[in-house]
């Protein structure tokens, strides 16, 4: 039986809450990352910790980032241990999604109160952004003539 994206994110969120309830607030991010990774494995949820993801600019690798955890090969987890999630944290996750073929990301904060933010970046929007960029570039080259 194939899991839906909602089933996958529910399983991840349940593991997140188990780790949060066990450890509580106050540890550094790496402790939570290791604990969540182990909890996902314990539940037989396929995941990879710290995978390096190439970032491309015009089909050339210009750098990479290291994701915290990728689950089911279809959900990026970005973990934080901060007082409160910020817009910058959300943008970081969206950029990670843009750099991959993965469309769903979860921002999980092990703060004073557990916080979860779900982000989706569809390939449809990626293609639309690329088409808009190409249209803008065409318009610029036409106007320069």
List the model feature ranges, each with a label.
Residues 1-46, 114, 120-145:
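Solvent-exposed, charged helical/coil patches
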Residues 24, 47, 67-85, 96:
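Conserved catalytic cores of phosphodiester-cleaving nucleases, focusing on short active-site segments
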Residues 41-59:
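A short acidic/basic microdomain associated with nuclease active sites
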Residues 54, 62, 76, 82-84, ...:
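Residue-level signature for short turns and capping positions that connect secondary-structure elements
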Residues 63-64, 90:
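Structural motif corresponding to alpha-helix initiation and N-cap regions
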Residues 80-138, 142:
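Nucleic-acid nuclease catalytic cores
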């Amino acid at each position: 039986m194939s899991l839906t994206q909602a089933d996958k994110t529910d399983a991840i969120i349940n593991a997140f809450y188990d780790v949060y309830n066990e450890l509580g607030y106050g540890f550094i991010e790496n402790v939570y990352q290791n604990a969540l990774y182990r909890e996902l494995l314990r539940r037989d949820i396929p995941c990879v910790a710290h995978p390096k993801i190439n970032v491309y600019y015009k089909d050339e690798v210009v750098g990479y980032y290291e994701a915290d955890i990728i689950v089911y090969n279809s959900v990026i987890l970005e973990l934080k241990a901060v007082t409160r999630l910020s817009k910058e944290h959300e943008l970081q996750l969206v950029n990670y999604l843009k750099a991959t073929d993965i469309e769903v990301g979860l921002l999980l904060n092990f703060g004073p109160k557990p916080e979860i933010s779900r982000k989706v970046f569809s390939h449809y929007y990626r293609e639309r952004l690329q088409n808009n960029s190409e249209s803008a570039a065409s318009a610029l080259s036409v106007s320069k003539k």
